[in-house]
Amino acid sequence: MSKGFTFEKNLPHQKAGVDAVMNVFVSATSHQEDNVSIRLLVNPELRLTEQQYYKNIKKVQELNGIEHVKNNYDARSNVIDVSMETGTGKTYTYTKTIFDLNKSFGINKFIIIVPTLSIKAGTVNFLKSDALKEHFRDDYEREIKTYVVESQKNAGKSTKSYMPQAIHDFVEASNFNKKYIHVLVINTGMIHSKNLNSTYDVGLLDNHFDSPFSALGAVKPFIIIDEPHKFPTGKKTWENIEKFNAQYIIRYGATFSEGYKNLVYRLTAVDAFNEDLVKGIDAYIEDIVGDGDANLKFIKSDGEEVTFELNENNKKTLFKLTKGESLSKTHSAIHDLTLDALGKNTVVLSNGIELKIGCSINPYSYDQTLADSMMRKAIKEHFKLEKEFLTQRPRIKPLTLFFIDDIEGYRDGNNIAGSLKAKFEEYVLAEANELLKIEKDEFYSNYLEKTVKDISSVHGGYFSKDNSDKDDKIEKEINEILHDKELLLSLDNPRRFIFSKWTLREGWDNPNVFQICKLRSSGSTTSKLQEVGRGLRLPVNEYMCRVKDRNFTLKYYVDFTEKDFVDSLVKEVNESSFKERVPSKFTQELKEQIRAQYPELSSRALMNELFNDEIIDDNDNFKDSDAYSRLKSKYPAAFPIGVKPGKIKKATDGKRRTKMRVGKFSELKELWELINQKAVIEYKINSENEFLSIFKSFMLEETERFTKSGVHTRIDKIYIHNDMAMSKSIVSDDDDFAKLNTMSYREFLDNLSQTIFVKHDTLHKVFCDIKDTINITEYLNIQTIRKIKSGFSKYLLNNSFNKFSLGYNLISGSIHPTKFTNADGKPLDEVLSSDLGVLQDNSKAPLDTYLFEEVFYDSELERRNITDREIQSVVVFSKIPKNSIKIPVAGGYTYSPDFAYVVKTAEGDYLNFIIETKNVDSKDSLRLEEKKKIEHAQALFNQISQSVKVEFKTQFANDDIYQLIKSALP
């Protein structure tokens, strides 16, 4: 099990967010502090004229498709905005930005401001993690040193008052040691605290600054704000933030409730869902059939007594309650709900819901049967997920999050029959015992045994009152939930159910939350996106690597009072995206966008159509204000609107499935079973010497890949210029690079041998042979091993069939179940439509010979194959589901083709075709890796053809499937 998350470098959507901020500072100059005594303690000043600042922002906005309007920029503001949807990696993005600002301009002191303690805990854990240090160390040779502002305990009888320790250490930290970037993390509560708003006897920076605000302002910090909607301008918190005297404030969030200052990047919710950067969402809505149409309204209060009006079955009844009374007095369905506080216009219920006069609740949403049903359903679905994910390789550990208001029933319910905890454990035990009876997977069976043996170990909770609790067991739970994601995700740890009372609603998340169950309504106006945000991130596997090769879904359970949850969420997702900018001219970019989806249109034909339909004029300008709209209507596939269908849906909508034309499967059966045989790739390398030669060639061709481990001397010189002391760094030409290896040669060979499965002797001989070109003893580090592994895998792929040949061994054995068949080999009635394609065409029926009743596809070329031009000789054809057939290729990669065809010739013979679609003009447009993978597929099907004839063909954008098949017929 990995000890930390594996971060991915240069994910396009995160890199774009980093680049957007960095490009704001193009042409900026860095100026050192004039005061020599504190120069190494403060940031250099980044200078940029207002004109250049405006020019940079405008250019960045144009690059990122952001409308350059007054609401999106203010050249007089030092606030820069980066909008990224929940779950897409805001924290990573701003952390990488910190490293880049340090690398480019020497900015060394940053303040990260977060709204809540839970966000602060998550941020600090992220910044301090060993995995993050390792991830950035290769590229930046720096690491972040984190300072956390906590509430300060009474200093006792000391006669002098001292600045809070974290602030003292941060302000006084010297930039002389270039190893560190200094980051102070502070939450809203601390900004308002007495600790920050006091003056102290012992000041900072040579005792010039005796208050935290003045001392922090003196270091000229860059400020990062997380969740900007929690920091409205004009309010007290923002006034205090301005006291930090930041050079620039960079705000990162999904919600900007007051609008933007200088918006430079936006990754919308639509982008996140459509590009599969987050999970899709299924909402499980618990409906009450029959009764349930009741309304309990707060109608008045005198500050001592509250009046509620119950309206049920057209009958109205008044109830008077005082503080502490139970609302069960008003309706029999209500349990565990009391009146906690009351004023003349507002009351607060024990579950945290605040009601103003005129507001109401539905009593049935507090019915115990409803809550029990939701909990049972969530537990049952959890175990279904768990069985699927923990019996595959690599394994994924799913988590389920329950939001509750019955804290006593959970925390104190151990020995109380019928308590929330007792019922939960009863339901979990029942499911686990049932699964144990039939489970054959050894690992999962043992995992279930642990569950049954110690049921209390499978769940944990975090509630705000826990912060003052001294119970060791509770403290352990909180540490796992709040601070140690890796421990929570460990397969050695049976805890996978988490309970909270909305304390975790914002600022906390875990990538492996696959279910969120709201056993009580939150009573909050928080956006639906914020609510589901706890589980939107893509999951990680047992090795802490993000899994992105398939579609995942977050299951969200709500009661009938939120029956419009999905509609509201979809509306919010689409409304949160940009209003589209309407261009005035038909550009080359638009032309390419249309032709990518309609490749049958030549450039000339497209332009002629647009001119004839009076969409554009002779100069390619749109003819009128409606022309762009007509263009989108004419070519809809090129202009997708909003979030894709099915990304957010009710669970009752079912998983998207499409019906198979089962009668046709018998005609495809032989080919389907043939291509589902397992195959093992065989490298036809005749001797160890031949392999040695290949590995040696790789090392000689890829010498620039490797980075030496070592130390060199940098000389910082202080000199006088115009009566002012200055410094500059010099690297001497005579500097001897001091080798500093992180492992011995033997350790390096052992590690490399195990990583790339090559004998020690072979590696040693190669390194001896090439020592005059590259002396491997200067590169003995883990980065070299990683680069050899990734580089050699790609080298094997790119040089297959050239420097060595290969073949395939087919493994006999049962191939069922498959994506099309059950364990007995019988065809399924329906399959997941997402396995066939993410796009759907409802306007056309599939061809009669197609295996399925609906049209799902991934490209326009695929759609044409499925819907256009029936081919008389084709008996049956089908899309090959994603990841159902994985052809092994050199270097450890795999390859999956797109279509299977069975054709009957005029002579009555049957021919089989496997088609790979490539939406490019020709083979010349393919990357080398794609060409090589196609060669591998060709080799496999050539071998299969020795027993049953199978033709493998590649279809390019301009290829008609009819002509492609016809050309191969005898």
Swiss-Prot record:
It comes from the Viruses. Signal peptide: none annotated. InterPro entries: Helicase/UvrB_N, P-loop_NTPase, RE_endonuc_C. Its EC number is 3.1.21.5. Pfam families: RE_endonuc (PF19778), ResIII (PF04851). SUPFAM superfamilies: P-loop containing nucleoside triphosphate hydrolases. Residues 894-918 are annotated as: Endonuclease domain. The keyword Isomerase does not apply. GO terms for molecular function: ATP binding; DNA binding; helicase activity; type III site-specific deoxyribonuclease activity. It catalyses: Endonucleolytic cleavage of DNA to give specific double-stranded fragments with terminal 5'-phosphates. Its cofactor is Mg(2+); S-adenosyl-L-methionine. Residues 75-540 are annotated as: Helicase-like domain. Belongs to the type III restriction-modification system Res protein family. Has a helicase-type domain in its N-terminus and an endonuclease-type domain in its C-terminus; ATP and DNA hydrolysis activities are mediated by the N- and C-terminal domains respectively. The C-terminus is probably required for interaction with the Mod subunit; deletion of residues 897-970 is unstable as is this protein when expressed alone. This is Type III restriction-modification enzyme EcoPI Res subunit. It comes from Escherichia phage P1.
